[in-house]
From Swiss-Prot:
Residues 263-290 have a biased composition (Basic and acidic residues). Pfam families: BTB. It comes from the Viruses. InterPro entries: BTB/POZ_dom, SKP1/BTB/POZ_sf, WD40_repeat_dom_sf. Belongs to the mimivirus BTB/WD family. Residues 16-89 form the BTB domain. This is Putative BTB/POZ domain-containing protein L85. Signal peptide: none annotated. Residues 250-290 are annotated as: Disordered.
Length: 419
């Protein structure tokens, strides 16, 4: 075959008509190649050679190209002649990641089969892996591998918010959380209908609906109107704090505008400003683990809710027409992104209406991160049972379950078996 003759000539150099100098941050490699071969095999080199022939007056028989990795780019060029040519100077995981980056630089697709070589990536390779993710438009198989390889103690602040959002979108959210009949917190797998964790609480919360799940994969907050508890799912431990505190501060501005703004944003940013002022003025009085930082008076009842703040180091709750912000130093902070669906940020494509269904008794609507919607309704006013229906984002019904108690979706909690 013709390509075999070109391959032999790489060593003989009788008909090579171009010298390419491949340069990166650490090395420089010269290769004698055939213009015909590299232009046919690679659009990047075709454009590069054409551009240089039009702009350079001197001979166009030697070109210098700055590449991400000179050694691996050399291997890719050799692959134009011989598909079996490889390089063993790097560990397999690094060679694979660097090769994807180099092929992207050269405007070449990468073979999805090489992803199979990435079963294990050491901690020092995560940064490089994140770079590869960004240039591959968050390839599903790569996102799955990132989930497998990223360690529990990894600092998520080093990961761009876009990748975190993508990670959540690939999470398999099959857990719901509810209060049991014996003052226990239950975690259920909605696909298998099996109880996967049962955490006994030593404070009475009964059938409260005030349950929220943190995005740091292990914390659940629960409230009964007087006390809130923080439950570490991984350790099956609970801590509690009552709302009553000697430290209470009222906002100096009691206008309706401030109140409505606080309600709509759930205090994710507005209370943070009050928080910083309160901390600086009353630092000596703060409690060792928890600090009730600010209280904002409202002109009307916004409803009974408890939420995590945007930075997930604060609990926000409403009681007696007042909104409180409670700082939680005990648990690690976690930066997360906010979503503005009105502006269609982060590719919010679906705004489907479910008009064909009757939702007269709906008591709760929540969403899974993988394009599923759960809504809840009571059977009737005389029956305490709740019907929960899971829908695809486009409105197709997937599953209906009935619970005696209200439930919440644990979007990001890990699968934890009962010990």
């Amino acid at each position: 075959m013709l390509i075999n003759k070109f391959k032999k000539d790489l060593k003989l150099k009788e008909y090579t008509d171009l010298t390419i100098v491949l340069k990166d941050d650490t090395c420089e490699i010269e290769m004698n190649v055939h213009k015909t071969v590299i232009c046919i095999m690679c659009k990047y080199f075709e454009n590069f050679i054409k551009f240089n022939s039009q702009t350079e007056k001197k001979s166009n028989d030697k070109l210098t190209v700055i590449v991400p990795n000179a050694l691996i780019t050399r291997d890719i060029i050799r692959n134009f002649y011989d598909k079996t040519s490889t390089n063993s100077e790097y560990p397999l995981w690094r060679y694979t990641l660097e090769k994807i980056m180099c092929r992207d630089f050269l405007m070449l697709d990468y073979d999805s089969e090489i992803i199979k070589d990435l079963e294990k990536i050491p901690s020092e390779g995560i940064t490089l892996f994140l770079e590869v993710l960004s240039i591959t438009n968050y390839e599903f198989s790569l996102m799955t591998l990132l989930k497998k390889n990223i360690s529990k103690g990894y600092n998520f602040k080093n990961i761009p918010s876009k990748i975190i959002d993508e990670l959540y979108s690939y999470t398999k959210p099959n857990i719901i959380v509810c209060m049991g009949n014996e003052n226990n917190l239950e975690l259920w797998n909605i696909e298998t209908n099996k109880l996967i964790n049962n955490i006994k609480l030593d404070k009475p919360f009964h059938h409260t609906t005030n349950i929220v799940c943190s995005q740091n994969e292990s914390i659940i907050a629960i409230s009964d109107g007087q006390t809130f508890g923080l439950i570490n799912v991984l350790k099956n431990t609970c801590i509690y704090k009552t709302y009553q505190s000697k430290i209470k501060y009222s906002s100096s501005n009691d206008s309706d505008e401030d109140a409505s703004e606080t309600e709509s944003e759930h205090n994710s940013e507005t209370e943070s400003e009050h928080n910083s002022e309160t901390e600086s003025e009353h630092n000596s009085e703060t409690e060792s683990k928890h600090n009730l930082e600010t209280k904002i008076d409202l002109k009307y009842n916004v409803g009974n809710f408890i939420k995590f703040s945007r930075s997930h180091n604060k609990i926000i709750f409403e009681r007696d027409n007042e909104i409180f912000l409670w700082k939680i130093i005990f648990f690690p902070n976690y930066e997360c992104s906010s979503y503005d669906y009105n502006k269609k940020k982060y590719g919010c494509d679906y705004y489907n209406s479910y008009d064909k269904k009757k939702y007269k008794c709906v008591v709760n609507i929540d969403g899974f991160p993988n394009d599923k919607l759960l809504y809840a309704k009571k059977i009737n006013n005389f029956n305490p049972k709740h019907i929960y229906t899971i829908y695809g984002i486009k409105g197709n019904e997937q599953k209906t379950i009935i619970f005696d108690v209200p439930i919440k979706i644990a979007k990001y909690l890990p699968m934890v078996k009962i010990s």
